[in-house]
Amino acid sequence: MAVSVRCCFGSSSLSHHARLLLVIVALLAPRLASGCDRCVRRSRAAYYTSSLTLTAGSCGYGTAAATFNGGGFLAAAGPALYRGGVGCGACYQVRCKDKKLCSNAGARVVVTDRARTNRTGLVLSSPAFAAMARPGMAASLTELAAVDVEYKRVPCEYRHRSLSVRVDERSRGPNELTISFLYQGGQTDIVAVDVAQVGSSSWKFMTREHGPSWSMANAPPGPLQMRLVVTGGYDGKWVWADREVLPRRWRAGEVYDTGVQITDIAQEGCFPCDTHEWK
């Protein structure tokens, strides 16, 4: 396994000018305010009675969502968190504000769907909603249709998994390639993806289709290596998977291990900043 992380802003970092502009715009906003990696925000949260709704969510994770975050603590996010699909896979700590019913720690959830309501900012799976309760109060909490909550983005942790790539069923090899990223750690967004044949320095960029899905119509022949630009701190960083990620004859529907994991934390702009762990 070979992993290297480098600052992305150099003369040869991004060959495509439009992508470079996109990265700069995405990374410039946090510089305009005090940096914080634990911005606490307020909203309301409801819950789905069936978690199947979230595993079949608009992020497109399918059955893989059942393996995220312990397999059940999932959420659908409103527009501010969903961000047109860019927010797919992000992790949040959510707690309700009724201290009689709810614990201080709350529940940690991962976004797998878009909330189809404007009444709440989050719709949790029923296990996640119940997990916000104090001991013995879960039944009372779930009797409520929705509750006031506060939440903050937190790093996703997949201790026993690397960042993985699933080749979408729509891919038509060897040139038409669509992939989705699974088990993305850290507290970042992937803002650019390049692929190249292993051993080659001729990188080609992929285009974001939606959320964790990226595609290209002119994929180089395999085996393929990858490099990503992720937000981290106030900057962007290259994450290199300079090994065989996709084999020469990759197959649609298969999941491949990149051999790397993301641990960076991107800064947000907010005040005050919550630096305390919710316990």
Curated annotation (Swiss-Prot):
Signal peptide (from-to): 1-35
Location of the Expansin-like CBD domain: 175-258
Primary localization class, coarse: secreted
Keyword presence, Disulfide bond: no
Inducers of expression: Down-regulated by gibberellin (GA3).
Domain of life: Eukaryota
Entry's localization field: Secreted
A GO biological process held by the record: plant-type cell wall loosening
Residues modified by glycosylation: 118
CC terms in the record's Gene Ontology section: extracellular region
Expansin-like EG45 domain sequence ranges: 56-161
Protein name: Expansin-like A1
Species for this entry: Oryza sativa subsp. japonica (Rice)
Originating gene: EXLA1
